[in-house]
Amino acid sequence: LVAALVGGCAQVVAPMQSDGPVPAYLVPAFRAAARTYGLLSAAQLAAQARVESSFDPSVVSRAGAIGIMQFLPATWAEFGIDGDGDGVADPRDPLDAIPSAARYERHLADVVGRLPGDRIALVLAAYNAGPAAVISAGGVPDYAETKNYIARVNDWAAAYAAEV
């Protein structure tokens, strides 16, 4: 186990394991979102969902982030879409949250993508820490939580590459 300092509290982070498959019903949504928004791959989007919520759409964080992709209400209000066409854009509905996350990350790429560094790492950092933190740092901020987030997403994306 690896201990990371998060918000002044020690958080125990289990090493990435290959026993967390992508739920089969979500694979088409990850693929469609990757095709539509053209930034993160389907495996990277699935990895984000794994890191954010372990694919649990009912998760609500202490900060109030909701659903499989952990949207804050204000971010959802701006970027949330009705991905499944049922007439309701709901951050708890993975079929809405997945394309909404890809849409938001396309926006983040426009905001932070010109900073020095890997564009995907910058977008993941902005998703995790907020675009203002990335802009202020001039790149990926030196936050243990954010660096750990990027590493975990990359690890899971590699694990999911053949699956998604």
Label each region the model flagged.
Residues 1-2:
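Sec-dependent N-terminal signal peptides
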Residues 5-57, 110-113, 163-164:
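Export/targeting segments at the very N-terminus of extracytoplasmic proteins
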Residues 18, 89, 141:
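Conserved short-loop catalytic and cofactor-binding motifs
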Residues 25-32, 36, 68, 73-136, ...:
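Alpha-helical segment that forms one wall of the substrate-binding/catalytic cleft
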Residues 64-66:
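Flexible, surface-exposed loop regions and adjacent strand-edge segments
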